Amino acid sequence: MTHIEIVEMDGQLVEGIGSYCLRSKKKSEGYKGKNKWLNQQFEKDLRYVQLLEDHKQVGFIEYTDAEYSSRVVHADGYVMIHCLWVSAVGKGYGTQLLKKCMDDAKQRDKKGVAVLTNDHTSWTPSKALFLQHQFQLVATAPYDFELLVYPFSEDVELPYFPHNWHDRLTGYHNLTILRSFQCPYVQVATENILAAASKLGLSVDLVEIQSRDELMEKSPTPYGIFSVIYKGQLISFHRLTVQSVYKKLQTLLEGPV
């Protein structure tokens, strides 16, 4: 009989069981950066919950109080889900993880639960599961981002996005990467940008986001933890291949300054 276990991680368990993403490359900079970030965020009550099937990692959910979230959303009093991932669909694993999050939020008297989705990238959770559980779409933002929310009562204020996305891009003329290690794949994404830039003889300004306030002020997308900007235009908010980056940058180099 299959044994299912939900394990709420802490620093000691992350050191032992390991975090979920990039676990096959535990010596990589991305994996080590993620674990360091997790240990810092555990002190701010971040929850990192893994689902084990017969002691094997098959899914996880990461969420935190919105006031400490890595998503550019105004949602004070809510829980914000960063990630939800399962290795197999149709087994109810996603529902179990989501229920864990919602139960925890209710027990802590939160206003509700919110999540950022985007159908055009796998870097955010799929919205299908949340719609199945009566989350409602409350806001949209450029680049196909959507904000889904499950409020616990009808009289609470709903979360919302900032509205100055375009203004956030205008100050960057040089090729610039804004990042934090909430996602371990940020390192690989960064390396691909650097490789493409090197082929074109471009220097890169790398900005490490150090705080929630800095994230809320500077990020040009709701995703928050990875943005590539050149000549006032967003190149990407997720990992691209070196060739894809090269083509995008080359197009901008050949166009008007």
Please give the residue ranges for each predicted region.
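Conserved catalytic-core motifs of GNAT/GCN5-like acyltransferases
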Residues: 116-117, 134-148
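Short amphipathic alpha-helix that is part of the acyltransferase structural core
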Residues: 1-53, 164, 183-185, 189-192
